[in-house]
């Protein structure tokens, strides 16, 4: 489907020269003098190469329709990440470039949304929250619990975050998958 360049947004998938690209960022620039342009940063899905393109805002670009489907995470190996569709039991392999910063939060059996073009995954969406265990943090200091200061902690997936003083090593906590920030102590 052909659309004007100014309507392209982050996460869209474009086809250019027979190759698929996922949009990382799109910005419309309106200089005081001259023609407005759309600055678009993209990543080629096939090999992960990043490119930057400039289009006039009225130029036509080929936008590809993608389908979002739920998949369960199975495992990771040297070739990539493996997911299974719960209804059909079809398995799909996703490259490290597509998974990107979501990799540390993937847990066996976790249901994620994969944006698919034909049989190729082009993007991944994690659940908003994940439950992880604190594997290393400073011990609780008496009298420090009244202040609203946070202390550094390392989670079971290797991510570093800030936690309240009452959280100790071995405690399971809920974090946002978007940035790894602390939400609450896990209820389980």
UniProtKB/Swiss-Prot annotation:
Q: Offer one example of a GO biological process linked to this entry.
A: peptide biosynthetic process
Where does it live in the cell? Cytoplasm
- Give, as in the UniProt entry, the pathway in which the protein acts: Protein biosynthesis; polypeptide chain elongation
Please provide one cellular component term from the Gene Ontology annotations of this protein: cytoplasm
Q: Where is the signal peptide?
A: none
Q: Which domain of life is it from?
A: Bacteria
Which CDD domains does this entry report, sorted A to Z? S1_EF-P_repeat_1, S1_EF-P_repeat_2
> One Pfam family of this protein, by short name?
EFP
Q: Name one GO molecular function term.
A: translation elongation factor activity
Q: Which UniProt keywords apply?
A: Cytoplasm, Elongation factor, Protein biosynthesis
Q: What does this protein do?
A: Involved in peptide bond synthesis. Stimulates efficient translation and peptide-bond synthesis on native or reconstituted 70S ribosomes in vitro. Probably functions indirectly by altering the affinity of the ribosome for aminoacyl-tRNA, thus increasing their reactivity as acceptors for peptidyl transferase.
- Tell me the protein family, please: Belongs to the elongation factor P family.
User: What protein name is recorded for this chain?
Assistant: Elongation factor P
What organism is recorded for this protein? Rhodopseudomonas palustris (strain ATCC BAA-98 / CGA009)
